[in-house]
């Protein structure tokens, strides 16, 4: 049994305020046509292979690097609260495996407070992922997300 302190020690978190309404940010996260535009660090191309957006549904995306190398990201959605929360398992082979992603959305007027948690299986693995560039990698992904959703409302 794990307590919240143990989970805190296994969790890396990014938070930002996105200058777009929560409904638009939510749509960007939940619709395959949108996901392909922003998922992945800058310079990568994403192809949505599968996106069964419901609790128990699977998702699978490929990310192609500029040199042509491909990475697969995939998981299973475990919890979806419309306009508030998405929880999914995630594998980013070969770099990251066995993690849980928690995307939290909170309306703040016409802006969205977006919180992203990645829960790792162990504290050691969490530290290793942080040292491998977690903040820069996911920061780049969410820069793409922010640029994309703000372009939708212009």
Predicted features and spans:
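Ser/Thr-centric signal marking residues that sit
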Residues: 30, 112-115
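A solvent-exposed, acidic/Ser-Thr-rich amphipathic alpha-helical stretch
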Residues: 32, 41-56, 61
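A structural signal for short, well-ordered beta-strand segments
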Residues: 14-16, 103, 116-118, 138
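Intrinsic-disorder/low-complexity, polar/charged segments enriched in Ser/Thr/Lys/Arg/Asp/Glu/Gln
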Residues: 9-15, 22, 46, 58, ...
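A conserved amphipathic terminal alpha-helix motif
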Residues: 120-154
């Amino acid at each position: 049994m794990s307590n919240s302190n143990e989970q805190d020690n296994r969790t890396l978190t990014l938070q930002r305020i996105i200058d777009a309404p929560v409904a638009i940010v939510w749509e960007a996260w939940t619709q395959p046509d949108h996901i392909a535009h922003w998922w992945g660090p800058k310079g990568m191309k994403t192809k949505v292979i599968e996106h069964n957006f419901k609790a128990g549904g699977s998702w699978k995306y490929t990310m192609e690097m500029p040199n042509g190398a491909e990475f697969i990201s995939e998981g299973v959605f475990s919890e979806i609260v419309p306009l508030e929360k998405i929880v999914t398992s995630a594998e980013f082979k070969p770099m990251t495996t066995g993690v849980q992603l928690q995307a939290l959305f909170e309306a703040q007027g016409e802006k969205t407070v977006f919180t992203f948690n990645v829960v790792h299986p162990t504290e050691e693995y969490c530290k290793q992922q942080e040292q491998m560039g977690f903040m820069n990698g996911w920061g780049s992904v969410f820069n793409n997300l922010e640029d994309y959703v703000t372009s939708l409302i212009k």
